[in-house]
């Protein structure tokens, strides 16, 4: 008997909560396990389906067996009597070994539902052990997950709300969610709203087929849901990333983070260098300003005392000193108008005479 499912698929968790937690697969599995255990324990005994039983030719033993209050000795007697006709049939059919292995597991008509449950569980355990023993080395499962990229997200949408919206439409299970927080501009200033916004994100599904169907179905459609919902009129912008895995995403994120950090370090070093040059210029300017003030004070003192060298116009010659660059004289071959002729050796003249 199946339990009744909830029909309110469009319920969205409130975004007013302060705790912004992402998806945790372990916590989700634990919560599912607890819920299944609680349902199994709270289910009434009349809803449990009884196990199949084999009809056996057993003689009735009094009316005490109807109320189910017989003793253990009576049950044992019934079991022995029920096994006798079975053994006779086994001998006639020639399958004694197989039936003997099954006879201690078969429940009698007087057995309780708890006993039948234990026998079924033991049989399943035997099957699982034999299957694992036959295949000791199982091949590892391939990574068949699919990733969808969201180029834009509705404002103030939390990861848990995004997961609930996708699962409510039948696209699951979702294993991982990663959303990039949007960077606020400096011109916006400080705002009282503490809710976070996300610019883009990635969602990993347990199946590639589910991810493809989700991207093809929901792309360029409105979020929908309740008429007065916060995200009713927003549009989905998603794309299935073929051949893209979650490890590639983490590698890309780390690479971009390293690039931004390296760029920031270069900018900081450049800013520090410019700051040093500026401070050196300021200090040098202060030194020159102090020298100029001292010279002005000295000029005032000389004017007041009437001392100092006086130049043209009666001004005190305390200006900047005139620098003279001394030039080296160029040596000339001619001296006193007489040009010195260079003498040529006799050997050289003889060789030149033979050539020319």
UniProtKB/Swiss-Prot annotation:
GO cellular component, one term: nucleolus
Biased composition (Low complexity): 108-134
Domain of life from the UniProt record: Eukaryota
GO MF term list: RNA binding
Compositional bias ranges of the Basic residues kind: 46-56
GO BP term, example: small-subunit processome assembly
UniProt feature, compositional bias: Polar residues: 34-43
Chain intervals for the UniProt region annotation (Disordered): 1-141, 298-318
Disulfide bonds: none
Domain annotation RRM: ranges: 146-235
Main location: nucleus
Positions with biased composition (Acidic residues): 13-23, 72-103
Keywords: Nucleus, Ribosome biogenesis, RNA-binding, rRNA processing
Record localization: Nucleus, Nucleolus
Function noted in UniProt: Involved in the small subunit (SSU) processome assembly and function, and in the 18S rRNA synthesis. Required for the early cleavages at sites A0, A1 and A2.
Family recorded in the similarity comment: Belongs to the ESF2/ABP1 family.
Descriptive protein name: Pre-rRNA-processing protein ESF2
Organism: Coccidioides immitis (strain RS)
